[in-house]
């Protein structure tokens, strides 16, 4: 994916860049695969904020994505490559020979007219989906299941992928982009290739307004707040935080503290922790 850079004709355009959308083949999504989606603005079912700095943004319809890839041994043809406002990756509309249409995540190298298929004995080609036990060691994969039949949960964002490094009994060892090495059941499915739109991380939004379009609200420093709002707040002028170490808004130590539950069951499947 190419990046389009703007000339600094205004302060908002200075250093701003956007996707050139050179891979996109249509701007009209498949209506049968669209559903309404209400923005939760970072709230849970009790109305409490669980994710800060969320809210507003433009309205958008949700595209139903086939993460399970369970339509076995039926050939599908890539009809379009489309933009999805709900994720960083592009999506591809697949027309299957039996008449069904589905969206999948668009991997790097997938083009209109290519044929894809899912199944246990599928060829090792980009966008084909099959169990990890049937994929050769060293292959790059994405959209990987953690539980058989649940659908892909790992490596779904733009430019992401994992590499199969070995097999052990009923498990396959994967190296994630973070550097983590973990076991996954060999019966879990994965899709061949790397997610496309890999230049997404190079986009510079240029101004706060573009982040607001995405539903991202401002992040206020704790030291700029009052003492009843944040442990760093209060004081005269630019006062220090007054603590031995930085704190979260809820008074717990921040930075360098491990937050993963030591009793989490999946800890036994992680061979090497991710790089810091």
Curated annotation (Swiss-Prot):
Composition bias type Basic residues, residue spans: 252-276
Gene3D superfamilies: 2.30.30.30, Nucleic acid-binding proteins (2.40.50.140), Ribosomal protein L2, domain 3 (4.10.950.10)
UniProt KW RNA-binding keyword: yes
InterPro entries linked: NA-bd_OB-fold, Rib_uL2_dom2, Ribosomal_uL2, Ribosomal_uL2_bac/org-type, Ribosomal_uL2_C, Ribosomal_uL2_CS, Ribosomal_uL2_dom3, Ribosomal_uL2_RNA-bd_dom
Domain of life: Bacteria
GO biological process, one term: cytoplasmic translation
GO molecular function ontology, one term from the record: rRNA binding
Keyword tRNA processing on entry: no
SUPFAM superfamilies with a match to the protein in the record: Nucleic acid-binding proteins, Translation proteins SH3-like domain
Pfam families: Ribosomal_L2, Ribosomal_L2_C
Region described as Disordered: spans on this chain: 221-276
Cellular component, GO annotation: large ribosomal subunit
Keywords of the record: Ribonucleoprotein, Ribosomal protein, RNA-binding, rRNA-binding
Family according to the record: Belongs to the universal ribosomal protein uL2 family.
Assembly mode: Part of the 50S ribosomal subunit. Forms a bridge to the 30S subunit in the 70S ribosome.
HAMAP family: Ribosomal_uL2_B
Role, per record: One of the primary rRNA binding proteins. Required for association of the 30S and 50S subunits to form the 70S ribosome, for tRNA binding and peptide bond formation. It has been suggested to have peptidyltransferase activity; this is somewhat controversial. Makes several contacts with the 16S rRNA in the 70S ribosome.
Protein name: Large ribosomal subunit protein uL2
Organism per entry: Aster yellows witches'-broom phytoplasma (strain AYWB)
């Amino acid at each position: 994916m190419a990046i389009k850079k703007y000339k600094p004709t205004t302060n908002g355009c200075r250093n701003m860049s956007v996707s050139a959308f050179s891979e996109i083949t249509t701007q009209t999504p498949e209506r049968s695969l669209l559903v309404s989606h209400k923005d939760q603005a970072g709230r849970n079912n009790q109305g409490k904020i669980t994710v800060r700095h969320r809210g507003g943004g433009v309205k958008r319809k949700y595209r139903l994505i086939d993460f399970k890839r369970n339509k076995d041994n039926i050939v599908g043809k890539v009809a379009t490559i489309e933009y999805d406002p709900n994720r960083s990756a592009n999506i591809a509309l697949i027309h299957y020979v039996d008449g069904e249409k589905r969206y999948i995540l668009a991997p790097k190298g997938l083009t209109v007219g290519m044929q894809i298929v899912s199944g246990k004995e599928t060829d090792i080609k980009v966008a084909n989906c099959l169990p990890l036990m049937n994929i050769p060691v060293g292959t790059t994969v994405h959209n990987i299941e953690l539980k058989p039949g649940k659908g892909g949960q790992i490596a779904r964002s733009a430019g992401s992928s994992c590499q199969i490094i070995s097999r052990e009994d009923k498990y396959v060892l994967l190296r994630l982009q973070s550097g983590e090495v973990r076991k996954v059941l060999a019966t879990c499915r994965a899709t061949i290739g790397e997610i496309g739109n890999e230049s997404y991380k190079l986009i510079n939004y240029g101004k706060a307004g573009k982040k607001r379009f995405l539903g991202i609200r401002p992040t206020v420093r704790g030291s700029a707040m009052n003492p009843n709002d944040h442990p760093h707040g209060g004081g005269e002028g630019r006062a220090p935080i007054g603590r031995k170490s930085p704190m979260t808004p809820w008074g717990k130590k921040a930075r360098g503290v491990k937050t993963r539950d030591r009793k989490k069951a999946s800890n036994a499947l992680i061979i090497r922790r991710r790089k810091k």
